[in-house]
Amino acid sequence: MKKLIWFASIFSMVLTTSCKPSSEKNQSQNDPIAAGDTLKGEISFSGAFALYPMVVKWADEFRKLHPNVRIDISGGGAGKGMTDALAKVVDLGMVSREIYEVEAQKGALGFAVVKDAVVATINVANPHFDEICKKGLTKATAAALWDNQYATYGDLLGIESTIPVHVYTRSDACGAAETWAIWFGKRQEQLQGTAVYGDPGVSAAVQKDRVGIGYNNIAYAYDMRSHKPYEGLAVIPLDVNENGQIDEDEKFYENSADLIKAIGEGRYPSPPARDLYLVSNGVPRNPAVVEFIKYALSEGQKYAIETGYIPLPQTTIDQSLKKLNP
């Protein structure tokens, strides 16, 4: 049975930002490209917390080129993004998982735009922090953790300890939970633990709970300014070869740059690494929307690493661009 915690103070439950055209003089007017730009219109997004920081960065840069385009972005989780896109409430849903066949049959068209990963997070003040980081997580261990099979850290680590394990999961339908669950053969609805709303909610819960364990997208586990985990958080290594310890080639979690490099090289498994999508209802016809997608898949890729993401290979980019002209 999941216990629900609401973090109403975090991002007011839904992240929202708006980039509006300004009547005042700004630096874009001095840009020869922006000064002669004729693209106008509005673009609306909602959905995955995983993709939110990247879309905000793209929107900021896109508006420098196209200052007469208004962009509205809100979070809410991948489930909301998909629902809103199919209902045409927004132009593009932000979705952090594969598009289901039933969604595609309803008109959902997904454009892979960047890559990300879900990581296990732990409070750095955990009494068994060193043992956990030396041992890491295997698929079987993670499956048991999010099935409430471990009551104590003694159960988890096979040692003498009665310290309880507090496991956190997501309350909202989201790509992070689904991707994390798929890694060890489950679905989001099968994950047990204290259910918390949103990526920021899970990271905040683990930060406040010295015996807490959760999972987060990279951008909510690491501070992209310092590239280190957020204060109070650490990332639990994955024991990919399942030999009961974290080997040297599995140690790449101290900073986001090393983790991103490992994901790009395939040393971090996929899942829980995965592509992130912008989803429309059918082929988009709004010129501003089309140009935004093209921008994200071209010049926008150069902002991926600095924002905490992994650029797409050219083959994936080409596949997404092809969907604009079926």
Stretches with model-predicted labels:
Residues 6-7, 24:
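Short amphipathic alpha-helical "recognition" segments used for binding
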Residues 19-326:
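Flexible loop/hinge segments at secondary-structure junctions
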Residues 8-15:
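Bacterial N-terminal signal peptides
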Residues 1-4:
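Positively charged n-region of N-terminal signal peptides that target proteins for export
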